[in-house]
Amino acid sequence: MSVENLSVASSTASKKGVVIIGAGLAGWHVIDAIRAKDTEIPITLITADSGDRYHKPMLTMAISQNKRASDLVRASGSEAANTAEVTLLANTQVTDIDPVSQTVQVCSTAQSDDALTTIGYEKMVLAMGAHPIFPKSLPQDLVWHVNHIERFSQLQEKLTTGSQHVAIVGAGMVGTEIAEDLLKAGHKVTLIDLNDAPLSQMLPAKATARITKAIESQGIQFLGGYQVSAVTRVNDDGNNNDSEDAEKLQVDYAPLSTNADNTDTQPLEPLIVDHVIASTGLTVDEQLPAAAGVEFDRRTGIVVDAATLRTNAANIYAIGDCMSINGVACRYVAPLRAQAATIADDILGHEHSGYDHKPPMIRLKNKAISVMVTGVPQAAGNWQVKTESDDELIMDLLDDNEAVSATVTIKAPAVPKA
């Protein structure tokens, strides 16, 4: 059930049960796992948005496929809540967690008053995800992100007016995937990164050089080794607002490192673009974990026990983008089902063998080049070539004991037969 009135929600949740904070893939996976084993235990799902169910990884492929946000939604939040028989508090912000009384304070984001409502819990699952990092040079009022379906929908609407020039800052997996998607949709794309090649924080130079060549061969402009210093409106002075440039943005950038002995270095001409997308990484909000006394790592998120996904705070679990295992952030979709099953068993008091975390296979969704990674990759390290040809590169990352800790396989796309 979906509840608009928080006073009703408080009485509905008076039976306590399970409270889940966050209605992304992780939160809904936990609900699915619990309901598969117990149809009676009360579950309250709290989310700052509508709680609609959709597959977030599809956002980096949807524009070229001409898919609207409504096409990606599998079920509205209220529909999904009714099906699962859970209490959904949509458009609701959690302001505090008291681990002693096992209560949360919430308020509505859809109503003008700031009245707080208290909801109790027996078990809590933090599934609040991670949010985009915006460096000071990328003001949020001018720069897009595609980490949420609502912002994706707003950007897509802007891109329907015809071919436009989009600058993407950050050439990790998401930025590189979005670049190809926008190009296929007919837009001009400039991809900017601090590193010399895409995916440089996870793969060695020999591998990333092939990715650079592939995306540039498509027509994507890649600016590697550059840092964006500012994004501003072209006509912030208020003049010429009727010109074609009225809504355009100026992107100032410079080489990350310059040769101090080179006195001939000239300032670079800024880019003039229609839109800027930030793909500069994710971070986890520390406020709620701190309030709950949950151990937190500012780099990787909420710290959990590897076998049970419990935090150090009694009766509180974490799952998905907001949590980390053994110092490594868990920001991939593939493990969510197994993580949710472990949490469900632990909450319900069922015997279970414990969660066995295995790094998921990572696939770049670009069609220009096939990139597949297994293990735990990192750019620095003892990477050894296993296979190398014009069409294929396979490299292994060896640890100190000469054991393989990661493998990257890069293949050129198959050429269609005439």
Task: Give, region by region, the residue ranges found by the protein language model.
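FAD-binding core/adjacent interface of flavoenzyme oxidoreductases
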Residues: S2-I21, R74-H165, V169, Q250-P270, ...
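Beta1-alpha1 glycine-rich phosphate/pyrophosphate-binding loop at the start
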Residues: V3-V86, D181-M202
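FAD-site-proximal beta/loop scaffold in flavoenzymes
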Residues: D141-G162, D264, E269-A338
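Short beta-strand/turn micro-motifs composed of small residues
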Residues: G22, T47, G170, D193, ...
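Residue-level detector of alpha-helix initiation sites
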Residues: G24-W28, S50, P132, E150, ...
